[in-house]
């Protein structure tokens, strides 16, 4: 985000109840009333952003549609801040105006955060909130605190302290896709980025070793780590891994195309099938990965 100078992560929570709520006629009114409990405001903001995309098959129009909705949300947050600062007679520094919860008709629940942990906490909270809202209206009304009281809670220093606002790690908010990540240089690279707070998407063909190393990394580091078993010479598998990457983290910042091997043999003895296999892994796979990453960079405008 150019406005906040912060790298943001996006998390999509696959949940039929959330999808049904986001697509319902009641969502426009019910979702804008407030939080289930006052302290949720520091994790979810006071209201979610609602999206009902009209241009799903046109990426440029969809980008403009989402950008317009975000600008409207941020403007409303600025007004919320100014109104409550004036009415409460307090001197506060405005927090970032981005939503934490996005409800997308036909899709469901998307969350935004500075770390994987933040996005997952926000998703957990709002999944429960949806249930509370529905049950409340089934038996009566849902009447949370008004905006002025939520403002007091959101800007209360003791509540903000819960977020643990320490200096961000060097690579916090960065999403790094690494191939050949189960051993050697790939694993060492993963550890280095994890030490610096990056979110990792680790890829390897060796399922057992990859799972084992991911478990070790998750115990050692607090950052978000996802993995996918992929044959990088298979274009369809690479494309599926990028789809999973987007669902998990929302995008990509860095690609480390590391997977490869060195086939040895005398020039007159190495058969053509072995050479072709070597080129598939050591040349064409890197082109496939780079192509997928560049397409995503272009969509992200990064």
Which residue stretches match the model-derived regions?
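Conserved glycine-rich Rossmann-like NAD(P)H-binding loop of the short-chain dehydrogenase/reductase
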Residues: 198-212
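The beta1-alpha1 cofactor-binding region of Rossmann-like NAD(H)/NADP(H)-dependent oxidoreductases
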Residues: 207-208, 229-240, 272
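A short, exposed helix-loop element centered on a Lys and neighboring polar residues
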Residues: 290-291
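A glycine-rich helix->loop->beta "capping" turn
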Residues: 221-224, 244-255, 263
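Domain-length cofactor-binding catalytic modules of enzymes
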Residues: 1-170
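Substrate-binding pocket helix/loop in short-chain dehydrogenase/reductase
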Residues: 266-267, 271-279
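Canonical Rossmann dinucleotide-binding motif of NAD(H)/NADP(H)-dependent dehydrogenases/reductases
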Residues: 174-201
